[in-house]
Amino acid sequence: ERETAQSFDTMCEDIYSGRLDYGIIPISNGRDGRLPVFYELINRYELKIVLACSVGADEGEKTLFALAGKSIPYPEMPFGEPTSLELFVTPGGGQSLTEMFRAAETCGMELQRIDSFGFSSVGEGVTFSPVFSAEGAEIGTFLLYMTAVFPQYTPIGIYRMIR
């Protein structure tokens, strides 16, 4: 397992440095849910999710794999119309996650899930990672809102989900 983690770390570093355009990493599975060690790599190497695919296993469990790159090709979206938007958000200064959820709903998005992480590189407090369904939504408008109201946010994925 340690060798596998080092291999993923090397791959992510290669994407960050430009030696690779993309890499595939697991981001969640049916047994453990979100996989924090891989989100730590996404955070550390400032990677972006550009495509996701759910793959079934023999036992019926599914693993979600992400195609990760250095940037989000928005609004061009060469991998198809986006169906999901994923962020890292560290609220502060009286900001409310409820306000963010209302803005997302106004822009045509729906919260699918939210997790929290304690990334040391982001600073004080907890970083939340909401995933919104974004098919047909006003993603650009929502990101403009986030820039104005939540300066401590990072889009980590605008992607199409392949099932």
Q: What are these model-predicted stretches?
A:
Residues 1-163:
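Domain-level signature for soluble enzymes in the chorismate/prephenate branch of the shikimate pathway
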